UniProtKB/Swiss-Prot annotation:
The lineage of its organism: Bacteria, Pseudomonadati, Planctomycetota, Planctomycetia, Pirellulales. It comes from Rhodopirellula baltica (strain DSM 10527 / NCIMB 13988 / SH1). Belongs to the peptidase S15 family. InterPro entries: AB_hydrolase_fold, CocE/Ser_esterase, Galactose-bd-like_sf, Pept_S15_Xpro, Xaa-Pro-like_dom, Xaa-Pro_dipept_C, Xaa-Pro_dipeptidyl-ppase/CocE. Its EC number is 3.4.14.11. The active site is at 231 (charge relay system), 348 (charge relay system), 379 (charge relay system). This is Putative Xaa-Pro dipeptidyl-peptidase. The keyword Transmembrane does not apply. It is an enzyme of class 3 (hydrolase). Gene3D superfamilies: alpha/beta hydrolase, Galactose-binding domain-like.
Length: 626
């Protein structure tokens, strides 16, 4: 293979090329000392509906890398100038040598330049009485910025560039070398990636520097863009799609946070994401705020974190408000035009599965091409690369591979590898029907679940104590700190598909209480090699003070009974023959809720309590209840 290396002293060639291609100087210098391939190649190469790896594109020595700043339509940092987002581009040399125009895989993130890491010293103290203002928290540690120009990140490059795609990264507002402030949701986190897509399609301005600089054009872009990413990086593609920006053809969000209220609250209750007790939206702001100089950071901290987030997040009541409304992408989903492949896990207790299910359902209703990939693991986990390939190849290269036809739901079964999902026409399973079961008393031991309601009023009482983990309470044979009701052993496996729903009539001896509900599979598997699906079926949480409205808490009248009804997290799981399905009701969930002083009593009226289970086939096969 012929390699041509220009002399260092051939600066006339360098700057002539820079002017012609409108590239940053750094990028052209990189190109100037890089080898050049001879002969033209065909891009893309498609086989069986997928873009294939092209040998000539695998060698990173033949990639062009450069960075730039794209101008947005907002000024968050108060300097009187429109904020610019830091963007990096990695593309095949053939975009210059053959003047190719290629589609783009775009990934945006607030994490590229670093975070506060595992330091949780500045998190909120969960030891808080319900309804009280939280104790003051500590200041967050400084972020040691990572990354060097022109490379922001190398994620996705090896997967997609050799298949004939340009890969683009950008840092979110207020992070890395992007200007502005983090807003953690809200308009700017949608408008920032929109600006980058507009630049890729020739509608927005790009520059070689964060201030001033020479114009940069994406002359190598075909104007067709796909986005993907996981967690926060999966939220941003959805945010961009809600703007309806032209050129964004397809997104594959993985475990996206689609509502910051649903991330930090649950049915009016302050409920932390799994593994991050004490985190709230202001904590996440500090976690990612790696951008700006000292003066800019102070401005952002004051005007965004303190005046907006800390003033409106409301850790005292957990109520919904306009601040949270503006950070819920379901409220903007009507703007989505791009095709969407949602990916999530049913046992993700960080970003719980409702985040993707609610968007999937709304997009289906709106007639947007959408499919769902779900697995049985925890947070993260993209679809198989072959599935993603088919989506990107279809929507970005126009290949008629039938990806939009056929099954709409792809679910990895309990014992299968994530690369081998099972196809279903839709989610939930079309044959799933609600089966209602009712509790029979047994406290402080275990009661039963049966398919007939009680004919006489019976109550049982539990005593709140956050000291005990939910896993401990579920396994306990005898405790006053939870109520638990189980089916008889299943005579056949039961396939749950959909969203369980709980109805409770309860009274409390205090004006406020946490309410937690778990569905569990018993007996509990205590083996070291147990899987998460062996024990936890699903969970849910709610604030009894928000029975009438999510926007306004009303103190409970001690001793008065209230009816409360809410969804648990969506699921699709097969409960094995011989297991029992258990409904556990308790108050404070040690790993998720606030930790008020123990001792609050919740009394449940069993005659007016029921659980609705979405069962494929519509029946639960039970052994004799005698």
């Amino acid at each position: 293979m012929t390699k041509l290396v220009r002399s260092r002293l051939d600066l006339t060639w360098v700057f002539t090329t820079m002017k012609r291609l409108r590239l940053p100087v750094l990028a052209v210098l990189f190109l100037a000392i890089s080898p050049v391939q001879g002969g033209e190649i065909q891009i893309p190469v498609i086989k069986d509906g997928e873009a294939q790896v092209i040998k000539e594109l695998e060698d990173s020595d033949y990639w062009i890398r450069h960075d730039l700043w794209v101008e947005t339509e907002f000024d968050l940092d108060g300097d009187g100038k429109l904020d610019r987002m830091h963007v990096s581009v990695t593309r095949p040399t053939q975009t210059d040598t053959q003047s190719l125009k290629l589609p783009v895989i775009y990934n945006s993130s607030p994490y590229f330049a670093g975070t506060t890491g595992g330091d949780e010293s500045y998190f909120w103290d969960a030891r808080q009485e319900l309804g009280d203002e939280p104790p003051k928290r500590s200041a967050a540690p400084a972020i040691e910025r990572e990354g060097t120009r022109p490379i922001i990140s190398k994620r996705h490059v090896k997967d997609w560039l050799p298949r004939g795609f340009v890969v683009v990264h950008s840092s979110a507002p207020g992070t890395g070398l992007s200007q502005g402030c983090p807003t953690v949701g809200d308009d700017p986190e949608a408008l920032a990636p929109k600006a980058v897509i507009d630049w890729l399609c020739g509608r927005a301005k790009g520059f070689t520097e964060p201030f001033g600089g020479e114009p940069v054009e994406a002359y190598w872009s075909s104007g067709k863009v796909g986005m993907t990413g996981t967690s926060y990086n999966g939220t941003i593609p959805l945010a961009a799609a809600t703007t309806g920006v032209e050129g964004l053809e397809v997104i594959i969000p993985v475990a996206p946070n689609t509502s910051y209220y649903h991330y930090y609250r649950s049915n009016g209750l302050v409920r932390h994401p799994g593994g991050y007790l004490g985190e709230d939206i202001d904590i996440l702001y500090d976690f990612i705020h790696s951008g700006g100089d000292e003066e800019t950071r102070a401005y952002c901290d004051c005007h965004i974190r303190d005046e907006q987030m800390m003033a409106n997040q409301d850790r005292a009541t957990g109520d919904y408000n306009d601040f949270w409304y503006s950070r819920d992408y379901l409220n903007r989903v009507d703007g989505v035009k791009a095709a969407v492949l949602m990916a999530h896990a049913f046992n993700d207790w960080n970003v719980v599965p409702e985040h993707s299910i609610r968007i999937y359902e709304a997009l289906k209703k709106n007639g947007v091409e959408t499919q769902l990939f779900m697995h049985q693991g925890g947070h993260g986990g993209p679809p198989p690369i072959s599935m993603m390939n088919r989506w990107f190849t279809h929507y970005l290269y126009g290949e008629d591979n039938g990806v939009e036809k056929g099954s709409k739901s792809w679910i990895v079964r309990e014992k299968d590898e994530r690369t081998k999902p099972t196809e279903y026409p839709q989610y939930p399973h079309p044959e799933a029907k609600d089966v209602v079961v009712y509790p029979v008393p047994g406290a402080p031991q275990r009661g039963r679940l049966q398919t007939a309601p009680l004919t006489e009023p019976i109550t049982e009482t539990l005593v709140d104590n956050f000291s005990f983990a939910g896993e401990t309470l579920a396994q306990a044979e005898y405790t006053e700190h939870r109520l638990i009701y189980t089916t008889p052993e299943l005579s056949e496996a039961v396939h749950l598909s959909g969203t369980p729903r709980i109805k409770l009539r309860l009274a409390c001896d205090r004006p406020a209480a946490n309410l937690s509900v778990w569905l569990v599979s018993l007996p509990w598997n205590t083996q070291k090699n147990s899987k998460i699906t062996d024990n936890i079926i699903t969970r849910g949480w709610a604030d009894p003070q928000n029975i009438e409205s999510m926007r306004e808490s009303k103190p409970l009248v001690p001793g008065q009974f209230y009816d409360i009804e809410f969804d648990l997290q969506p699921d699709d799981q097969v409960i094995a023959k011989g297991q029992q399905i258990g409904l556990m009701v308790f108050s404070s969930d040690r790993d998720y809720t606030l930790h008020p002083t123990p001792g609050t009593k919740l009394t449940i009226d069993l005659q007016h309590t029921q659980l609705s289970l979405p069962v494929v086939g519509g029946t639960i096969p039970l052994e004799s209840q005698d």
